[in-house]
Amino acid sequence: MMDKRRTIAFKLNPDVNQTDKIVCDTLDSIPQGERSRLNRAALTAGLALYRQDPRTPFLLCELLTKETTFSDIVNILRSLFPKEMADFNSSIVTQSSSQQEQKSDEETKKNAMKLIN
């Protein structure tokens, strides 16, 4: 039976590349036992983004700095996927408002029960 496992290796150069330095610093801050798991997850997440648009992981990688915020990442995703992000945002707003309506209805019922009892 053939072993189908694959070893993936590449070098990071933190002295030359700022993104590589951020990656190395982050990996150094993680317990050694968790690093392989994070490396695998990061590769898988990058490939998931690549499958949506091959530019995505490269843009995120190139624009990563110590100051990169979640909002910066969302803005990059908005520029690459304007329709999908707009659809995503509208579904969140719809969910949020219907959840608020449900909470309001529940609160009204509770208040009514207090008046009855």
UniProtKB/Swiss-Prot annotation:
GO terms for biological process: plasmid partitioning. Residues 92-117 are annotated as: Disordered. The keyword Phosphoprotein does not apply. Keywords: Plasmid, Plasmid partition. InterPro entries: Plasmid_stability_protein_StbB, StbB_sf. Gene3D superfamilies: 6.10.290.20. This protein is thought to be involved in the control of plasmid partition. This is Protein StbB.
